[in-house]
Every structure is written in C-alpha cells, then in structure tokens.
UniProtKB/Swiss-Prot annotation:
This is Thiazole synthase. Keywords: Cytoplasm, Schiff base, Thiamine biosynthesis, Transferase. Belongs to the ThiG family. The lineage of its organism: Bacteria, Pseudomonadati, Pseudomonadota, Gammaproteobacteria, Alteromonadales. It holds the Pfam family ThiG.
Amino acid sequence: MLRIADRDFHSRLFIGSGKYSSADIMQKSLAASGSELVTLALKRVELERPTDDIVTPIQNLGLQLLPNTSGAKTAQDAIFAARLAREALGTHWLKLEIHPDPNYLLPDPIETLKAAETLVKEGFTVLPYCGADPVLCKRLEEVGCAAVMPLGAPIGSNQGLLTRDFLRIIIEQASLPVIVDAGIGAPSHAVEAMEMGADAVLVNTAIATANDPVAMSKTFRDAVIVGRQAFEAGLSQNASLKASASSPLTEFLESL
C-alpha cells in the first residue's frame, strides 16, 4: 500500500491521459492498468464544461485526478493554472510542471521550487515534476510537497532511466514518496525503477502510443508489481565480474 498525503493507493502504476487515439481507448487502457491515479493536462480541459469526454471517463472509473500545469513557463503561470484546476475540477491534488524549453521539456528547478512553496501554503497536494537532482528533491520535500517526481529521461523520449544513479540517491535520502516520471518507454524500465526502490512510476507515451494500448497497460501493471516484489524481497548485492559458484566442490573433493 502506498500512501500519498490523504490517500492510499493499491497500485503503484500511475498513468497519463494524453496521446491516446480516442477517449474509448484511453478508458479501456486505464481500466486494464489497475491504476488509481491519472494525470490530466489542464489545457485539455474545457473549463466551462469540465465534464467533457476527457474528464468523464476518468471520473467514471473512480480514479484520483491529478491535473498538471503542463505548458507553464514560470511559477506565476503554474500558480494561476493550479487555481483554475482546483476551481474547475474540484481537487486540491496537483502535478506541478514548469518547463520553459519547448524542445526538451526539462523542468525549471528554480521556478518549480518557488511555485511549490506557494501552492503548499495554499493547501494544494503538490507532486512536482523535477530533474533527478537530489538537492532539489530534498528542498521540495522541506517546503511540504506530498511526493517528488524526478525524471528518468526527457518527457516522451522512451529512453529509460538515464538518470538511474541520481534516482538511487534521491530514493535513499527521501522521506516522502518518489515517483519516477518521464522517459519510461518499456515495462523493463518500470521494473528497474521499482527494483531500485521507487514508490511508483508514471507512464504515458509508452502505453498510449503502443500498437495495443490496452495490452500494454496490462503489461506495465504486471511489471510494476514484479519490480516492487523484487525490491521487497531484497535483491542480491553481490554484483561482480568475478564468478562465484553457487555449489562449490572444493571442500568435497579435498575430503575424498
């Protein structure tokens, strides 16, 4: 069981709602994934009619909505978007995203920290998307964020955990949930993140753009479960180039 702020989650797989070919495919994929939390770009919601064909399928599944501030370039932009999201969707949960660079969509650490501090004070449950920077993640924890969401690789790149060494440090130091976000392009990437001790992963592109998004959702569901089980079982730390026989015959042969 994973607890974030005031909610418990059985599933450690969180899903993004973008890039699906239709609302129907999205809904079926979400159901197949077993996920209980879905991110939603505020720019895709009609604020005058928030119960449109994007929001309704998610609400019908009883999932936790996590609106994000994708498109915000400054802390001020993100704070404004967050207030709109709370008003339109009736949730204080927020994925904080600030990325001024349109090419790589890398998060701005300074603006993210600034916005997080303000939004926490305003009563938001803030989950910031951030670089895999252990110092920044600790600062975000200190200002009261409910979790941190460091990237594995640039958004939508499907490159896997390019930041694995820094993710390990973040996980080791954190006293709050660590959700690996961005760059997870295959179920094996999700397994790796969970094996190293991440509390959850967020996946969008790898599922939504798969040939069969519903089947891929199921595969990611299973991958996250297996990765977490491996972590809890305790992975062997005896990684070495030198061989080590599992059943050495030395003493047996010497006794003959």
